[in-house]
Every structure is written in C-alpha cells, then in structure tokens.
C-alpha cells in the first residue's frame, strides 16, 4: 500500500477510511474486491428499514471506503488484513453493515479470483461458513433480525437461501450461524468469516476473553488466510479489560513499535479531543460563551457520526446535556471517545488536543532541552527534546529492550545523546541516573560546559529522581497544567502518546503533590517516554525564566 503523499490526520481519525492524499483524493488501496462486493450487495440485498426500506442496499460513502480496505488484497490476491475492528458511535449502522457483509460472505464475490485490466476480481467462496459471535443472544438477534428484510427474493431464489432464527443456509452448502457465550461451540471449527459483535461487552466474567481467544486460534489455523474476523464495537470503558479494550491496546502497541503488525485493521472516528461536554454547565451564565461551546459540541457530534446522517444531532445533544447521563458515558456512546481510567494522569483526549498538525519539525540548530530516562532490561529507555522556542516535544529515540535481545544497547543510546548535542543547541539536560550512572557522568563531563543551565551542582546533566522526588512532582504538576492549558505541543508521536496515557497518579509525602508511575510495578504499560517529556519540559521552563536565557525570543509559559 502506497502511503506517500498523504495529508496529516488529527488524532480523532484512526485508520484509513477518512484519510486523504495531498491531491484531495481519498486514500484507497490499489487492489480491492470491494467494487464487486458492493455491486453484488446492490443487486441482491435490500435496505432493511427507514425511508428507503425495500430499496437496493447501498452503503454510505464512508462504509464503502471501509469495505475497500477490508477487502483490499495484494498483487497475489492475499488479503492485507487478517482481522479488524470497526469502532463507531451508537446508532452509526454497524449491525446493518455487518449483516450485509455476512450475506455477501455467504454467497457473494468475496474470494480473490484474478486481476483483470488492473482490477482485482472476486468470486464466491466455496464452503462459506460465517459465525456471528456474541456474549448474549440479544446481540446476535440484532444481526439475525435484519436478514429476512435484507435478503431479496432474487437472493433467496438464485442462491437457495433458507433463513431461520439463528441459522441461514445456502443451496451451495454455506451457512451463517449465531454463537453466544460458548467457547466450546467455536473450538476447532473452520469458519471463513467471523463477526465479533459489540466487543465492548466481551469480558472475562462472561467468557468473552475465552471466545475471542478461540476465534483468534481459528483464524490462525486457517490455510492461506481462508478465515478472517471483524469486531464491531462502541468505545469501551477503560479498565474493564474488555476485548474491545484489548484490541485498542493492541493497535496502540503496534503504532508505538511495541508489537509486530500481523495484519490488523483498526478503524475509528471520534469527536475532536476539544469537544466540550462537562464544560457547558459552567458556561450557563455566559450566553455568548455557552453558544460557542454548544456549537463546538454540535460540530463534534457531526464529525463523530461520519456519513450516518440519519442520526439526529439535536437528539444526541439533548442526551449529552441530560444531567442523568454521566459525562464519561456520553463521551463513550455519542462521541466515540475512549475516556481515561480513574487514576490516570492525562486523558487521551487531553493529550490529543495538544497535537499540532502543522508543527515545524525539529531542525538542526534548534535550541532545545533534553530529558533522559534509562533502563537496562525491564523498561524502555528514551531521549526526548523540548524546543525552547515553542515548548514542542519530540521523541529523538526510544529503545524497547525486547527488540534488542532483552537488553537496551547502551552504546547506541550513548551515540544518540552525542548526536543530539552535535545537531541541536542543547541548553539544558535532565538525565535520571538509575541504571545509566556511568554514562550520565560521562555526558556531564563531556557536555557540561556547553549547557546554559546546570541540573546538579556536581554533574550538569544529572537528575537523580530517587533524591529529587519533590522536584519531579512539581515538574509533573507543571506539565499537567501545560497540557490542560494547551501551552505544550507535540507532533503526535505514538510512543510518547502511549506512555503519556499509560501513566497513573501516585501520591507523595509533599502535601497535595503527586508523581507518576506505572499502573503496577510489573505492568507492561510503559511510561518512560512520559518521564523524559516531564524532565525535558521542566528544564525548558526553568531555562526560559532564568538569567541564562538571553538574546532569543521564546514563548514563556506559566
């Protein structure tokens, strides 16, 4: 897939469906079976409800673009994606789309045949076996109740369809079956397409985890990519460990370089991070400010609904403003936003709101401060720069020990620090000492004279967090305030984002101050790049207010 020449996308757009090229054209794969699949849907399926009930089924443009990626293939006809997640707000039309896809998988041209005149051509799949899996009968009922209305007379007659409450048969021997809360019913089966319905409710307590594991195993066992699985969900509730949350975490891990992409399509459309909800009540006495905030909420809902124009924006806004509905649930259901867990430090939407799409890249000679946090084998090691001019954060390098035989390559880390000092005008550096003390001492000796600001009286770059807990807690507080006030910016680096949102608050012995840490000591959700960002930003703040800052304009943040 050619990803060159793409426009940058804001954080609320995840996946390829809403991406565009610099030419203004939609970003689409070179080869896809979607054209044949959608033409088949138009010929054989009918709209199940609404003003167009009974007319030929036509997906929205947004749904069509999603289908182009789900059915994208390479030159040899192999699907680009083995599994996927489609996350949209409540009422977007996920069930009708999945019902249409299930019927197409049963009898339509969903298997690659050949390339003709530069276009991939599809053919019906032999022995089609579709499973609609859920953790409750109500969930599968949502999909199966659509089949009688969607299957046209032509479809029933030409393909010999028999539609029952939880089973659909075709004359060719294909079947669509409902599977609920029964991992044993899935074990060892060889389906060709599996729908995981409403995975935000798939929990360990209702066998959701086990079912997802069995489905994943069936997909892995299928020869030549003959089986694929697609999850549909609303935004999940963080901390519940639902399958939807696990899928989201897997996507973030891939983006951050913590995991290998094995063919996962994750597609979501959220309201922008700065869409106000709880803020509206505080503005009630200021009519002008309230109206402006209400317009931003309206715009956020319009963005999140995508092409689902049947969703009434006024009705959704009324539900959001109903004080009986928790703000977190309104954001989850109607804005499709993933909220923060209760003890999290910075919410994803708070961090995303600080991303600047037109941010000037870090360039040679830029005046910066550096933050460093090192580890030998258990945690990551990272080096982050904060540009003095505009408080922009950049991850210079990050090392995952698992990618280096279980141990961070120290000489590589040293070379990166040397390169940073050679490339940029480094005015201050804060480096945690633990597990990298010898190198921190070396950097202090080698570069100390160049620094405008000294981190420690004995070593200009040394910042031992074991002995400076209060200083670090103050820096954490200042960093959080800057994020909330959007006076710190970043380029959307996926590693830094993941580490920022992984960090949780930890109490200290200093009045109301808190520090940050991992969720648990052995948690795999790392925060090292976040620590570096705090150190770099703290050094920047100290520098711009010091007497050492002379002669060059900067934005002073308070």
Regions found by a protein language model. Name each.
Residues 47, 206, 333-337, 451-558:
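C-terminal nuclease/phosphodiesterase catalytic domains that cleave nucleic-acid phosphodiester bonds
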Residues 170-172, 387-391, 484-485:
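Short acidic-glycine loop/turn motifs at beta-strand connectors
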Residues 200, 279, 345, 353, ...:
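Conserved luminal/periplasmic juxtamembrane motif of membrane-embedded glycan-processing enzymes
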Residues 5, 11-27, 238-250, 258-259, ...:
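Mg2+-dependent endonuclease catalytic cores in nucleic-acid-processing enzymes, primarily RNase H-like
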């Amino acid at each position: 897939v050619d990803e060159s020449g793409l426009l940058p996308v804001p954080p609320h757009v995840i996946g390829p469906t809403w991406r565009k090229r610099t030419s203004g054209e939609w970003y689409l794969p070179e080869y896809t079976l979607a054209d044949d699949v959608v033409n088949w849907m138009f010929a054989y399926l009918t709209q199940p409800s609404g003003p167009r009930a009974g007319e030929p089924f036509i997906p929205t443009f947004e749904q069509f673009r999603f289908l182009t990626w789900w059915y994208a293939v390479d030159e040899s006809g192999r699907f680009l994606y083995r599994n996927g997640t489609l996350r949209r707000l409540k009422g977007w039309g996920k069930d009708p789309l999945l019902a249409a896809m299930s019927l197409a998988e049963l009898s339509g041209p969903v298997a690659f045949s050949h390339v003709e005149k530069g276009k991939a051509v599809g053919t019906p799949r032999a022995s089609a076996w579709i499973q609609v899996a859920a953790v409750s009968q109500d969930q599968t009922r949502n999909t199966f109740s659509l089949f009688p209305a969607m299957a046209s007379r032509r479809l029933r007659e030409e393909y010999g369809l028999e539609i029952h409450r939880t089973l659909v048969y075709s004359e060719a021997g294909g079947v669509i079956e409902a599977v609920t809360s029964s991992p044993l019913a899935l074990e060892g089966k060889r389906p060709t397409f599996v729908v995981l319905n409403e995975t935000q409710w798939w929990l360990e307590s209702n066998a959701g985890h086990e079912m997802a594991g069995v489905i994943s195993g069936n997909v892995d066992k299928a020869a030549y990519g003959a089986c694929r699985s697609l999850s549909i969900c609303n935004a999940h509730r963080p901390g519940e460990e639902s399958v939807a949350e696990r899928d989201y975490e897997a996507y973030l891990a891939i983006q951050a370089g913590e995991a290998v992409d094995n063919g996962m399509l994750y597609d979501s459309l959220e309201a922008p991070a700065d869409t106000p909800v709880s803020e509206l009540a505080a503005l009630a006495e200021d009519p002008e400010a309230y109206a402006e905030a209400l317009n931003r909420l309206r715009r956020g809902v319009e963005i999140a609904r995508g092409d689902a124009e049947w969703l009434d924006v006024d009705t959704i806004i009324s539900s959001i403003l109903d004080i009986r509905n928790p703000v977190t649930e309104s954001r989850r259901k109607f804005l499709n936003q993933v909220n923060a867990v209760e003890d999290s430090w910075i919410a994803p939407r708070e961090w995303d709101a600080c991303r600047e799409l037109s941010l000037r890249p870090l360039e040679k000679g830029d005046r910066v401060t550096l933050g460093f946090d090192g580890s030998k084998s258990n945690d990551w090691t990272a080096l982050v720069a904060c540009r003095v001019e505009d408080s922009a954060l950049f991850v210079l390098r990050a090392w995952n020990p698992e990618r280096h035989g279980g141990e961070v390559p120290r000489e590589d880390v040293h070379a990166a620090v040397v390169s940073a000092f050679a490339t940029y005008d480094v005015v201050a550096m804060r480096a945690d000492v633990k597990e990298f003390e010898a190198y921190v001492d070396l950097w202090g000796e080698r570069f100390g004279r160049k620094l405008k600001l000294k981190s420690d009286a004995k070593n200009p770059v040394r910042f031992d967090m074991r002995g400076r807990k209060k200083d670090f807690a103050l820096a954490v507080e200042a960093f959080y305030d800057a994020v909330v006030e959007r006076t710190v910016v970043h380029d959307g680096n996926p590693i830094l984002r993941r580490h920022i949102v992984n960090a949780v608050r930890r109490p200290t012995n200093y009045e109301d101050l808190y520090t940050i840490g991992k969720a648990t000591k052995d948690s795999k959700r790392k925060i090292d790049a976040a620590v570096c960002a705090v150190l770099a930003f703290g050094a920047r703040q100290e520098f711009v207010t010091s007497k050492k800052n002379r002669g060059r304009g900067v934005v002073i943040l308070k």
